[in-house]
Every structure is written in structure tokens, then in C-alpha cells.
């Protein structure tokens, strides 16, 4: 299995904070609120702006209650459910994210189509998992820092979900990272896991998103800043995967991920 690229080797990490980056982000915002996009919708850019779109299907996997739906909601700038309700079927969410490529200095609009399915539905209906995996470009594997069992279940999840697709992008995400006082997953265990599996690992918080001045509306720009590391990480891994598949890059970079 090819090693993933080093962080920041494909995508310019903090480009979204630059003046140019903020101009592109404006197309996925409306008055500092995130725009919602349906399956057939896309951001509207000025006629003078020519930009390529790279589309990817991403299946989100993990035990019930680890925060799969909450993660997708955060990435899309939607309200995170306060009370946990298991997803009853397959739920798809589209997220657009502009990013600048380091090698070419070009901006690409990444379109991520997240597929989320409740654990009970996956067990009850045999066709659910194949449907989620069909034509997938990447898998996100979630665990909760407050649920030791979800972390110990990761190897089984990786084998069960991605065992037949060893070459696809696989990323591990630890949710509820802000609840460090109650963590059941110490740093040494994370280090051992990363050394064994050589997969990118990101941490996300479970705190509610910041609000605009009205106290009710989610602050779209603040939400993007909070999740940019995950969106950039996804873009980096997927773009690198495409370049390797096209024969434009070697399958194993010289350096391991940091």
C-alpha cells in the first residue's frame, strides 16, 4: 500500500486564510453563512474565474454514536444534532472546498459527496454497505476519544469496509477531541496505531460551532476555519491518489507522513 503524502506537500495549507483564498471561499458563503448544495448544485463563480472541479465520493464509517453525522454536519456548516439519533438509512451531503495546488499554483474546486449510514441499517440490509462502497474514492474511519471500544474497533472496520480496496484513500478521524479530560485513548495508543497502519489521522472537536451576532446563525467563516485541516487533508490525499493513478507521480513518496 502506498504511503500517503506528507501534510502540506500537495495543497497549500493556509491558502484559505489569504486574500485570494477568501475571495474563492465567498462562493460557498452567503452573508457569512455557509451555502447548502444539493446533489446537482454547484457554487456560482464570476465569469472571469475559470476553475476545474474534482468530484469524490467518500464513505464515512464508524460505530454508532461516534459522531459520523455530526462530523459531516460540521464539514458542511450545518447544525450539529444535540441529541444522538442513529441515521436510519443512507444520507448524502455535498461539500465544496476550494484549494490551491502547491505544484502548479492552480486553484481546484473540490466536491466531496459524503455518504453516511447508520450501523443498524448496515446490519439489517445487506445492500447498504455495497451501495456506500460502490465507486467510493475514500473512506473516513471515525472513533471517539471518549469511547475506547470505538478505537479498538478500527482495525476491524478497516478490514471489513476497505479490505477489498487497499489502494483507496483511508483517513482516520478522532471525534470529541476537546473532551480530553475524559479521553479513553491516550497519545501512546494513537502513536502505536499510526506506526502500524501508516494512515493520516485528524482530530475534531465536538463543541457547538460559533455563532453570528444574532446568536442563532452559525458563523460560516469560523466553521470553515475549524474544519479546514480536515477538508485540506481530504483534498490532499485524493488529489495525490489521482496523480498516482494517472502515472504522474510515483506510488510511494520518499518521506512518510508527519
UniProtKB/Swiss-Prot annotation:
Impact reported for residue 169 to D: In pxb (pixiebob phenotype); embryos show ciliopathy-like syndrome of defects that include polydactyly, loss of ventral neural cell types, craniofacial defects, and heart defects that are likely to be responsible for death before E12.5 of gestation
Effect of residue 69 to N: Loss of localization to the cilium basal body
Region (Small GTPase-like): 51-258
A Pfam family per the record: Ras
Keyword annotations: Cell projection, Cilium, Cilium biogenesis/degradation, Cytoplasm, Cytoskeleton, Exocytosis, GTP-binding, Nucleotide-binding, Protein transport, Transport
One Gene Ontology term of the molecular function aspect: GTP binding
Subcellular location: Cytoplasm, Cytoskeleton, Cilium basal body; Cytoplasm, Cytoskeleton, Microtubule organizing center, Centrosome, Centriole
Main location as per UniProt: cytoplasm
Binding-site residues, GTP: 64-65, 67-70, 82, 84, 87, 176, 178, 206
Gene3D superfamilies linked: P-loop containing nucleotide triphosphate hydrolases (3.40.50.300)
Family (UniProt): Belongs to the small GTPase superfamily. Rab family.
Role, per record: Required for efficient primary cilia initiation, regulating a late step in cilia initiation. Plays a role in the final maturation of the mother centriole and ciliary vesicle that allows extension of the ciliary axoneme.
Self-association state and partner proteins as the record states: Interacts with FUZ. Associates with the CPLANE (ciliogenesis and planar polarity effectors) complex via its interaction with FUZ.
This protein's name: Ciliogenesis and planar polarity effector 2
Gene: Cplane2
Amino acid at each position: 500500500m502506498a504511503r500517503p503524502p506528507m501534510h502540506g506537500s500537495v495543497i497549500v495549507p493556509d491558502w484559505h486564510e489569504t486574500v485570494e483564498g477568501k475571495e474563492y471561499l465567498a462562493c460557498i458563503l452567503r452573508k457569512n453563512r455557509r451555502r447548502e448544495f444539493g446533489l446537482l448544485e454547484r457554487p456560482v463563480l464570476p465569469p472571469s474565474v475559470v476553475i476545474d472541479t474534482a468530484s469524490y465520493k467518500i464513505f464515512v464509517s464508524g460505530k454508532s454514536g461516534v459522531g459520523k453525522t455530526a462530523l459531516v454536519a460540521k464539514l458542511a456548516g450545518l447544525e450539529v444534532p444535540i441529541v444522538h439519533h442513529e441515521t436510519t438509512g443512507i444520507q448524502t451531503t455535498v461539500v465544496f472546498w476550494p484549494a490551491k495546488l502547491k505544484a502548479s499554483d492552480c486553484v481546484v474546486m473540490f466536491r466531496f459527496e459524503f455518504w453516511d449510514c447508520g450501523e443498524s441499517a448496515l446490519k439489517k440490509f445487506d445492500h447498504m454497505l455495497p451501495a456506500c462502497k460502490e465507486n467510493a474514492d475514500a473512506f473516513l474511519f471515525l472513533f471517539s476519544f471518549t469511547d475506547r471500544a470505538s478505537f479498538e474497533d478500527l482495525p476491524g472496520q478497516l478490514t471489513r469496509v476497505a479490505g477489498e480496496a487497499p489502494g483507496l484513500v483511508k483517513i482516520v478521524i478522532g471525534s470529541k477531541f476537546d473532551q480530553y479530560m475524559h479521553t479513553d485513548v491516550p497519545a501512546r495508543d494513537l502513536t502505536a496505531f499510526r506506526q502500524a497502519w501508516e494512515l493520516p489521522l485528524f482530530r475534531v472537536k465536538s463543541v457547538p460551532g460559533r455563532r453570528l451576532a444574532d446568536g442563532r446563525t452559525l458563523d460560516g467563516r469560523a466553521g470553515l476555519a475549524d474544519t479546514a485541516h480536515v477538508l485540506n487533508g481530504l483534498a490532499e490525499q485524493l488529489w495525490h491518489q489521482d496523480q498516482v493513478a494517472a502515472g504522474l507521480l510515483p506510488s510511494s513518496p520518499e518521506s512518510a507522513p508527519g
